[in-house]
Amino acid sequence: MLNKNNILERLNDLKPFLQKEYSVKNIGLFGSFSNNSFSDESDIDIFVEFEKPIGWKVFTLEIYLEKTFGRKIDLVTKNALKEQIKDRILKQVKYV
C-alpha cells in the first residue's frame, strides 16, 4: 500500500531520471499523502520545479508518474499555485 515514505523513496530513486528526461530541479510531495490523511480515492499531489520550461512535456511527466504509482497524480508547479494557497502548499511540500 502506498504511503508517504514509499512515495518519497520512489521519487528519490526516480529523481536522476526525472532531472535528465524532464529537467526537474526539485520534486516533492504535498497534500493528503504528505500529512497521512489519504484515502483509497486520494490522488498523489506532487510539486515540481523545472530547470527550464518543458512545455507540453509536463503532461508526459504526469502520465509517467501515474503509471509509476498506479494512481492519479496532481502535478503542480509554483506558477500554477493560486496566491491564496501558495504559502500553505509551499510549507507543506516534502522534497526529495
Walk through the language-model features, giving the residues of each.
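Short, well-ordered beta-strand segments
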Residues: G28, D45-F47
